[in-house]
């Protein structure tokens, strides 16, 4: 089991596709190098931004394998391994465990509409069947379930549940969880627009970010400045993060992020159905913001 303490800005990597919708492995490898060279603290393959739900199991395994190989332990990896099927989640989590990733990111099960007890038993089953650190992924805007703090604290009480990624934007949640459980755990926000507030008010330890695909250095600089008590520098960087986050979610993620990366790095904006590429109106929004931030 990894002993790495997980904190900082972890980029939720896009999965680049070629025009025929196959995985562009060469571009994915270059994207990882770009992230690491821009001081990102960690990487998250096969999360929401990585379009994991449209990957076959074989493709999923290849993306994780390639990320581990290219990264070569230079930064920690939290691998997405969740689904709404407990047995499938166990299968994926055992796979990422075999590659010695630093943690698995397990989403709250969606679509089935499980009860509180069902959610707990899902995480307990994955926990008990594996030996890799697990991070809860709470994103109710996609799962239609927002577990209450008591339930989250109960899940966090399991020994190898080491943290949570909370994408609600609720900066009070970390404080509430700390009151409910006597255990040190990683507190990642998944809401780019409120990441600095999550640090300042909630005691957050990091962000798993879609926006950092586009601005890894600005994002890591914000984190580093805040924890070095350089608040003005952190706020200046956060201004860019906040502005960009507003346009990168103008349409379903990761379509706007992929379009931005096509303008900055020449990466294909191709997404897999049922997602589609940006409308012309939204393309213009992204282009204008990138110009405003001097990114193109």
Swiss-Prot record:
Catalytic activity: L-aspartate 4-semialdehyde + pyruvate = (2S,4S)-4-hydroxy-2,3,4,5-tetrahydrodipicolinate + H2O + H(+)
Binding site for pyruvate: 49, 208
Keyword Lyase: yes
InterPro entries linked: Aldolase_TIM, DapA, DapA-like
Top EC category: lyase
Broad class of the protein's primary localization: cytoplasm
Pathway this chain belongs to: Amino-acid biosynthesis; L-lysine biosynthesis via DAP pathway; (S)-tetrahydrodipicolinate from L-aspartate: step 3/4
The entry's keywords: Amino-acid biosynthesis, Cytoplasm, Diaminopimelate biosynthesis, Lyase, Lysine biosynthesis, Schiff base
EC number: 4.3.3.7
Catalytic residues, chain numbering: 137 (proton donor/acceptor), 165 (schiff-base intermediate with substrate)
Record localization: Cytoplasm
Top-level taxon of origin: Bacteria
GO cellular component: cytosol
GO biological process: diaminopimelate biosynthetic process; lysine biosynthetic process via diaminopimelate
Annotated site (Part of a proton relay during catalysis): 48, 111
Biological function: Catalyzes the condensation of (S)-aspartate-beta-semialdehyde [(S)-ASA] and pyruvate to 4-hydroxy-tetrahydrodipicolinate (HTPA).
PANTHER family in the record: 4-HYDROXY-2-OXOGLUTARATE ALDOLASE, MITOCHONDRIAL, DIHYDRODIPICOLINATE SYNTHASE
Subunit structure, as described in the record: Homotetramer; dimer of dimers.
Family indicated by similarity: Belongs to the DapA family.
Name of the protein this chain belongs to: 4-hydroxy-tetrahydrodipicolinate synthase
Organism: Ehrlichia canis (strain Jake)
């Amino acid at each position: 089991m990894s002993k790495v303490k997980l904190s900082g800005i972890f980029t939720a990597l896009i999965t680049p596709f070629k025009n025929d919708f196959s995985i562009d492995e060469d571009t994915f490898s270059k994207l990882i190098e770009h992230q690491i060279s821009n001081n990102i603290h960690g990487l998250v393959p096969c999360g929401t931004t990585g379009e994991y739900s449209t990957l076959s199991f074989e493709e999923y395994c290849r993306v994780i394998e390639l990320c581990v190989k290219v990264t070569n332990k230079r930064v920690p990896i939290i691998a997405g391994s969740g689904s709404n099927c407990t047995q499938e989640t166990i299968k994926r989590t055992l796979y990422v465990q075999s590659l010695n990733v630093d943690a698995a990111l397990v989403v709250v099960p969606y679509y089935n509409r499980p009860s509180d007890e069902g959610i707990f038993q899902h995480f307990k089953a994955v926990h008990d069947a594996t030996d890799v650190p697990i991070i809860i992924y709470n994103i109710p805007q996609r799962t239609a379930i927002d577990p209450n703090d008591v339930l989250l604290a109960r899940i966090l009480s399991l020994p190898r549940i080491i943290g949570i990624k909370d994408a609600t934007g609720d900066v009070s949640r970390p404080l509430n969880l700390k009151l409910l459980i006597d255990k040190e755990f990683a507190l990642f926000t998944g809401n780019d627009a409120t990441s600095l507030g999550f640090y300042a008010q909630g005691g957050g330890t990091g962000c798993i970010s879609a926006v950092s695909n586009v601005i890894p250095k600005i994002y890591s600089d914000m984190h580093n400045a805040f924890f070095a008590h350089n608040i003005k520098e952190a706020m200046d960087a956060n201004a860019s993060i906040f502005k960009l986050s507003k346009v990168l979610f103008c349409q379903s993620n990761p379509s706007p992020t992929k379009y931005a990366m096509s303008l900055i790095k020449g990466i294909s904006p191709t997404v897999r159905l049922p997602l589609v590429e940006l409308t012309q109106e939204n393309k213009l929004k992204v282009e204008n913001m990138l110009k405003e931030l001097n990114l193109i």
